From Swiss-Prot:
Keyword annotations: Chloroplast, Membrane, NAD, NADP, Plastid, Plastoquinone, Quinone, Thylakoid, Translocase, Transmembrane, Transmembrane helix, Transport
Official protein name in the record: NAD(P)H-quinone oxidoreductase subunit 6, chloroplastic
Subcellular location: Plastid, Chloroplast thylakoid membrane
UniProt main location, coarse: plastid
Length: 176
């Protein structure tokens, strides 16, 4: 969307804080149903981020595929599990949990360092100029294919990895 600067910045901060709060809800809610709804909220916030960056097709695909199908599938799977499995006593921290949290924290810190060291101003203008040039030369379906294989390759790969980890976690919970 082509919004004014302060409105665009406010929406980015608002959606970012909603994304962080929703992510914390996914991890911290003791009830898996609430966690699944919080995951749906996070995926909807990601879709709204795509709308703010003028990627309407990617936003629609995000809503239809991840919020509409995958999240509903997760909610159904959680609803069919026994409720008694949610409240079993277990050790809060094991060695694997400590190693996993250490790896996740190091990845998070490296991503924050990379984000802060990147010059985003040039990246944004380069992307907008490429979009203007591509709109004149090729059709919209070809533009979608080019954008999915170039500009939006990393977001789709990251989402697929996150989805894979979530499904492995769901299988591990279902086996117990």
């Amino acid at each position: 969307m082509d919004l004014l600067g302060p409105i665009h910045d406010f929406l980015l901060v608002f959606l970012g804080s909603g994304l962080i709060l929703g992510g914390l809800g996914v991890v911290l809610f003791p009830n898996p149903i609430y966690s699944a709804f919080s995951l749906g909220f996070v995926l909807a916030c990601i879709s709204l981020f795509y709308i703010l960056s003028n990627s309407h097709f990617v936003a629609a695909a995000q809503l239809l595929i991840y919020v509409g199908a995958i999240n509903v599938l997760i909610i159904f799977a959680v609803m069919f599990m026994n409720g008694s499995e949610y409240y079993r006593d277990f050790n809060l921290w094991t060695i694997g949990d400590g190693i996993t949290s250490l790896v996740c924290t190091s990845i998070f810190l490296s991503l924050i360092t990379t984000i802060l060291d990147t010059s985003w101003y040039g990246v944004i203008w380069t992307t907008r100029l490429n979009q203007i040039l591509e709109q004149d030369l090729i059709s919209s379906s070809q533009q979608i294919g080019i954008h999915l294989s170039t500009d939006f390759f990393l977001p789709f790969e990251l989402i697929s990895i996150i989805l894979l980890v979530a499904l492995i976690g769901a299988i591990a919970v279902a086996r117990q």
